[in-house]
Amino acid sequence: MIHAVLIFNKKCQPRLVKYYTPVDLPKQKLLLEQVYELISQRNSSIQSSFLITPPSLLSSGSETINEDIQIIYKNYATLYFTFIVDDQESELAILDLIQTFVEALDRCFAEVNELDLIFNWQTLESVLEEIIQGGMVIETNVKKIVETVDELNRTSNQEARFGNGLGNAFQAITMGGFSNWGARQ
């Protein structure tokens, strides 16, 4: 199972934090900091993208997860894409899933960068939700992921325009009716 997906930059500033296992808020911050410390100290040219972490990090209250927890990450430019998984997941499959995630983001944003993730967080979350739900992988076809997210974005843009039209109509009614409607547009 995938317990968490973390995207953070080289200054430990989170760009996406998604937990699929309940984790207390203070522990979420601690986990992010500890994962950052573990990853940022590694030399990616000679060390692998796989780390084993103590399972106590992902415990919630009296519940403790007894599986071996692994951190699987990939560095792209200034961002670390990090998946925290249990021992039931294949390390290479998760590494490939990170690549799929980044490829889908690249297609949605035309060469994704950190600012895209900051200002378009809804699309970022939509892409992730098309790939993973409830800690389980549901889609890995980049083309299908991008098509679904594009359709979702088109639908939300249409709803936003429709909402603006209603807002303009309401404003026109409250300001004296529709007689000056064309002049205000």
Curated annotation (Swiss-Prot):
It comes from Eremothecium gossypii (strain ATCC 10895 / CBS 109.51 / FGSC 9923 / NRRL Y-1056). Belongs to the adaptor complexes small subunit family. One of its GO terms (cellular component) is cytoplasmic vesicle membrane. Part of the AP-3 complex, an adaptor-related complex which is not clathrin-associated. The complex is associated with the Golgi region as well as more peripheral structures. It facilitates the budding of vesicles from the Golgi membrane and may be directly involved in trafficking to the vacuole. Its main location: Golgi. InterPro entries: AP_complex_ssu, AP_mu_sigma_su, Clathrin_sm-chain_CS, Longin-like_dom_sf. Keywords: Cytoplasmic vesicle, Golgi apparatus, Membrane, Protein transport, Transport. It is a peripheral membrane protein. GO terms for biological process: Golgi to vacuole transport; protein targeting to vacuole; vesicle-mediated transport. This is AP-3 complex subunit sigma. Adaptor protein complex 3 (AP-3) is a heterotetramer composed of 2 large adaptins (APL5 and APL6), a medium adaptin (APM3) and a small adaptin (APS3). It is found in: Golgi apparatus; Cytoplasmic vesicle membrane. PROSITE patterns: CLAT_ADAPTOR_S. Transmembrane segments: none annotated.
